[in-house]
Amino acid sequence: MARRVFLHVGAPKTGSTFVQDVLWRNRRELKRAGILLPGSARAQDAAMTDLRQVPWRDADLRWTWDRLAAKARGWPGDVIISNEGLGGASSVQAARAVESLLPAEVHIVVAGRDLWRTLPSTWQQSIRARSGWRFGAFLGAVERGEFDTFWENYTANRMLRRWGDLVPAERRHLVTVPPPGAPHDTLWHRFAGIMGIPDGLCELAAPTSNPSLGAAEAEVLRRVNLALGDRYPLRRPYQEVVQRHLVDSVLRQRGNGLRFGVGLDRAAWVADQAERQITELRDYPCQVAGDLAELRPTGMTQSRSPDELDDGQVLTTAIETIVAMLEQAEALSTRADRRYEEILARVRARVDGGVRRRLRRAGRR
C-alpha cells in the first residue's frame, strides 16, 4: 500500500514540462529512494483522459485511471502522479481520483503563475490544441465572463479549491512560479521540497522548455486549424501530424520572432484580477511553496497581438514555413533511403554468407 501519493494536477503553463522532465529522467534514482512514478508520461496522460472522459481520448486506452491507481496503491513507498490536464477534472472526477488512491495519504499540488503571462500562453495552448479563435476574441471572452473554462482550468485558486477541498489543509500545496530571471532550479526545489525528494538526488539538466510561438507563427497555425475542417478531430492524430510535422519540426524552431501578449488597455483589469486571486488564495488554508506576491504581474509593457498582423506578414511566414517543411521532408526521405540501404546490405550479407556456407558444405561432400 502506498504511503503518500502526490497528485500534481496543474495548472498548465506553469513550468510543468521542466518538472516532469526532471522526474522522468530520474525515475530510476527516485524508485531506488522509494518514490514511484507509475506507468510513463504517456500512460499518465492517457489515464487523465480516461478520468476526465474527454471526447478526444483514444478509444483503445491501455492505461485507464483505474489501472494507474492500482499501480500506485501497490507501491509500498511514495508515489508521484503529474499531469497538468488533471486540473480540468470536474469535482466528481477529482473526488473519484482521490478516493481511488485511498487509504494512502493523498496530497494535492497545484502551481500558479501571474495572469499577465498566463493569458497569452493559454490562448497559444488552445491554438496548439486545434482551436481557431483569434487572440482578441479569447481575451474578450475571458474579460466578459463568457469563457469560465479559463478560470476553472488555468488558474490556481479554483483548481486548488476543487481538488484541495478533498484533503486536509496540511495536504494542499500551492507552488508559485518564480518571476523571469530567477534561477532555473528554483521551481524544481519548490516541488521537490513538497514531495520529500532529497536535495541532490535528481540530476538537473538544462531546463526543458515548452517554447512559445511568435505572433506570426501562432497566426499561421490558427489559420491552418481553420483550414483543416473536420480532419484530425482527435488529439493523437492531430499531434502525430500537425504537432509533429508543423509545430515541433518547423514553427517552434523559428524562434519567437515577434512576441505578443495582453495589451496595456487591459493592464488594469489584469492587475485587479490578480489581486483578487491573491486575496482568495491567502484566505484559503494551504501550504505555499514560494510567495503569493509572485502572482502579481510585473513588467507589463505594450506588445502586439497576432490579430494586428497584416496578410503580407502572415503570408511571408507561411511561405518560409513551407520551405522549412520541404527541407524537413527531404531530410526524412534521405534518412529513410539510408535506412533502406542499410537493411538491404545486411540482408545481402546474410544471403551471401548462407550461400558460402552451403557451398563449403557441398564441397566437403
Where in the sequence are the language-model features?
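Anion-recognition interface
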Residues: 1-365
